[in-house]
Amino acid sequence: MSPSQQRYDFELISSWIPEGARVLDLGCGDGTLLAGLAATQRVVGYGVEIDPAGVLASVANGVDVIQLDLETGLSAFGDGAFDFVILSQTLQAMKNTEKVLGEMLRVGREGIVTFPNFGYWKHRLDIAMGHMPVSKTLPYQWYDTPNIHLCTVKDFEDLCAKVGAQILDERVITGGHQVNFMPNLLGDLAVFRFKRK
């Protein structure tokens, strides 16, 4: 992966996953995260992807992948089947985020979600200037975006409380650096680790 394509959320996720863990990567895209985890942490994992091109790319990357629409649920997987269920920069494209989080909590001991923080100051400034934000974490124009549910760090904390998820760790980053001061304002990417209460 080139430096311009580096996914800092992948680095953080990798630091949370122990060797040999059972991992389900929802919306796995080309399988880069899962392939990396298999190589470095020897995880046993599966990817779930709806896009046929993503499925083919995942297979080419050596990832076991299932073509499935996350909106229909994860009935193919039993309760507690995985140690970790990951949803990386996909939450904002889900129609029913509450249901998806509930399914993550059902099939996994822990969940990890990453998403672009809509509360980031540059996004707020773009809106104040009269247009929707376009950035590294929100790379689409308003008219061609798959993102339908944008949220802030605080919004996601509230959703976790609503669905009965206990937040174990949360990090907000900008340009690969953790933001500790006013993270909802100064961080452009949020990474949460949680489990069922």
Predicted regions and their residues:
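Alpha-helix C-terminal capping/helix-to-coil transition sites in glycosyltransferase folds
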Residues: E19, G80-A81, V107
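Class I SAM-dependent methyltransferase "Motif I" SAM/SAH-binding loop
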Residues: G27-G29
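A short SAM/SAH-binding and catalytic strip from SAM-dependent methyltransferases
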Residues: F84-K95
